[in-house]
Amino acid sequence: MARPEGGYYQDGIRVVSLTEALSATRVRRWSGNERSWDRRRKIGSAVHQACAILDCNGKTWDTAPREWIEPYDAVSHEVRGFCHAWERCKEEQEIIIHLVEHSFFAKLEITLFATTIDREGLRRGEPALIELKTPQLKEAYWGVQLAGQEMATVANLGPPRVRPFKYHRWVAQLFVNGTYKLIPYVDPMDFAIFRQSLNIAVWNRNAYGE
């Protein structure tokens, strides 16, 4: 299931998303003014869409047909730099991709939630979940987001079948100059924070319609 537009639904019922849960509890929050946030959001969305098309078709920004990338280049010329950064990350980190922008429904105890993982695959032969990020400053919620995504992935696919039989969680922080940082997340507290955020978000929705 690819990332849906307009929210996640199961049997006609809207399901709370991972990012909605983190936003409702202010684990995930935005800094800066509304105008800068909107610009960041548009560029980030274009980068995700462009990288997904390229990854799914085994192309790079420079080898893809022009008609594929022109819509994203039109959003901002910065998109090219971010895509080059992801291409460099994949090559240098020996990343093999199995799933691209793949959505899951998952139950955490009795609470249903939905999420979309950016990439699932291998990094240097070991199982990896990788989030692509374009903000220039590291944001605190990234580890919690990845923890929720790991829960959803394992609930749907089961544990990885290659050593060490668990996922390593990474953020590929991409920069417009074509460089990147690959940031590991290992804090077990991230899982507890996600559980609490999801429960509070669902309670708020049921109690107040929020």
Where are these regions (language model features)?
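Metal-dependent nuclease catalytic cores that hydrolyze phosphodiester bonds in DNA/RNA
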Residues: M1-F113
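Nucleic-acid nuclease catalytic cores
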Residues: E78, I95, H102-E210
